[in-house]
């Protein structure tokens, strides 16, 4: 199972242990990689590090055959392109608020004609600086895990359609921002928050029951 990607393991029904990386210390990253986690998320949205710092972290982790995911700073196509180019195993995009934004995130991850990601395969860490150009698009389709965060009332209202967007692998609830959007910052026991949380969770409970 360890030889499978996170995406493949999740599809097989495996339960994985992951952690967030907020400290941009290569030594801390090495310790984390040796601690038995299945995956990790390098946080560029709220963490203090830059994209260059993320590369250093990934280099430290790669010595232990550990490939992390990255939370991007936003869904801006230029941001997404630069994150993908350094070669994470997956990416989380914060605060996707509508079906169109979800579609735009998917398109930003794909080369033409299916998307609008800029192509420079010989220059990318993601392709081994040109060593693994052949098959990279297939790897992206089969192994790369694309996660979007649901953090607003607008997203909850459109959750059925957002979840149906082809190319989105996972929804991840951002509880603090979601509670703020609902006018109940940090009030996780409020009716507004519980109703929104249950609406998202029941979407997947219903899918499982149908199967």
Annotated model-derived regions:
Residues 204-211:
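Conserved small/polar residues in nucleotide/adenosyl-binding loops
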Residues 12-24, 145-156:
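Active-site mouth loops of central-metabolism enzymes
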């Amino acid at each position: 199972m360890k030889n499978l990607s996170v995406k493949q393991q999740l599809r097989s029904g495996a339960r994985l242990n992951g952690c967030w990386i907020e400290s941009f210390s290569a030594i801390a990253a090495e310790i984390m990689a040796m601690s038995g986690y299945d995956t990790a998320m390098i946080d560029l949205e709220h963490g203090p590090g830059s994209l260059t710092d993320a590369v250093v972290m990934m280099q430290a982790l790669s010595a232990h055959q550990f490939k992390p995911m990255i939370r991007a700073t936003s869904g801006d196509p230029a941001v997404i392109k630069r994150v993908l180019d350094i070669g994470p195993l997956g990416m989380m995009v914060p605060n996707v608020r509508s079906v169109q934004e979800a579609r735009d995130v998917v398109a930003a991850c794909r080369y033409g004609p299916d998307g609008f990601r800029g192509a420079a395969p010989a220059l990318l860490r993601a392709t081994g600086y040109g060593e693994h150009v052949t098959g990279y698009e297939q790897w992206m389709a089969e192994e790369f895990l694309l996660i979007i965060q649901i953090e607003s009332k607008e997203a909850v209202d459109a959750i059925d359609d957002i979840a149906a967007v082809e190319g989105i692998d996972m929804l991840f609830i951002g509880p603090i921002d979601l509670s703020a959007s609902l006018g109940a910052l940090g009030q996780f026991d409020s009716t507004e928050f519980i109703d929104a949380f249950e609406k998202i969770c029941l979407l997947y409970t219903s899918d499982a029951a149908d199967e």
